[in-house]
């Protein structure tokens, strides 16, 4: 069993999934299951030379303050919220949507997946876990119909059964048994990508067993959205698709109004933490573990607030 991680925004190292791997390993060991082979792909390095948009915004704001006595908060409100979305999401997202950078990112992911398959030629089962923008990239790679014939996405499709016919009889192909997405805005960005859910259904129909897709949403993550209704999946079918929620008590209802100016800063940091915390949550690792081994009963019974539901 191979488990391939695809990270989301702001990640620039390959250790982002280590804590989650440890939790999954522990969960599998408790269940008497064999530990899979993990691989943390890393495409963030492609973005190291791209401009940091918020630096330009901050420079303009500083220049404004030098020449004006007006409080910057009166002419540019919610700056901490804006900084969060620009620095921690939009910067990487719109860079991926750039044709050249997007091609390069898909190339990096393709080469890393091919490296993994070459290193473990006897493994026939692939599972993909994608976070944030990584989920959007995965959706794009697997099912977009807009790429040119030489796009790296087709290298990935060529090694996954059901996505493309292998051109060589001896070519290695693996079965994609499960997908787990975490904190991903596929719902929003598919309006731009224009990918038909029918492509997913067609792919899933080529497998004897249902393809499992668990989409995990943390309650306070503003970038995470359910996808089941938008995909219009006729359940039961060859696709097992579940939106699963990770709950948390909404303390901001009572505390935010009393924080004054600190409220915006605190909430901005809270939003960032909510979006990145999937890598550290035991409830997330348990859902992934259940998805890896096909324990659909455990997935369906998962309680948003309880850790030990199985």
Task: Please identify what each model-predicted range represents.
Residues 1-59, 91-129, 133-310:
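Lipid deacylating catalytic domains
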Residues 63-104, 133:
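Extended, charge-rich helix/loop segments that form flexible
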């Amino acid at each position: 069993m191979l488990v391939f991680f695809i990270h989301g925004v702001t990640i620039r190292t390959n250790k982002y999934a280590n804590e989650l791997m440890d939790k999954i390993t522990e969960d599998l060991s408790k269940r008497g299951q064999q530990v899979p082979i993990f691989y943390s792909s890393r495409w963030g390095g492609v973005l190291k030379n791209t401009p940091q948009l918020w630096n330009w915004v901050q420079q303009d704001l500083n220049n404004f303050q030098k020449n004006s006595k007006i409080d910057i908060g009166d002419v540019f409100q919610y700056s901490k919220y804006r900084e969060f979305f620009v620095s921690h999401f939009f910067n990487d997202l719109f860079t991926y949507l750039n044709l050249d950078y997007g091609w390069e990112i898909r190339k990096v992911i393709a080469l890393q997946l091919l490296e993994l398959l070459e290193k473990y030629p006897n493994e026939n089962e692939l599972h993909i876990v994608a976070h944030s923008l990584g989920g959007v990239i995965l959706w794009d790679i697997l099912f977009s119909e807009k790429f040119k014939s030489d796009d790296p996405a087709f290298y990935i499709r060529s090694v996954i059964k059901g996505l493309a016919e292998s051109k060589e009889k001896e070519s290695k192909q693996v079965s994609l048994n499960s997908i787990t997405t975490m904190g991903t805005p596929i719902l929003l960005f598919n309006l731009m990508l224009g990918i038909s859910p029918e492509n997913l259904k067609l792919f899933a129909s080529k497998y004897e067993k249902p393809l499992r897709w668990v989409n995990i949403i943390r309650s306070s993550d503003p970038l995470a959205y359910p996808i089941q209704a938008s995909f219009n999946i006729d359940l039961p079918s060859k696709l097992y698709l579940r939106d699963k929620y990770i709950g948390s008590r909404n303390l901001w209802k009572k505390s935010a109004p009393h924080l004054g100016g600190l409220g915006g800063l605190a909430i901005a940091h809270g939003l960032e933490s909510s979006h990145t915390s999937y890598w550290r949550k035991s409830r997330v690792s348990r859902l992934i573990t259940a998805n890896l081994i096909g324990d659909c009963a455990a997935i369906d019974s998962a309680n948003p607030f309880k850790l030990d539901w199985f």
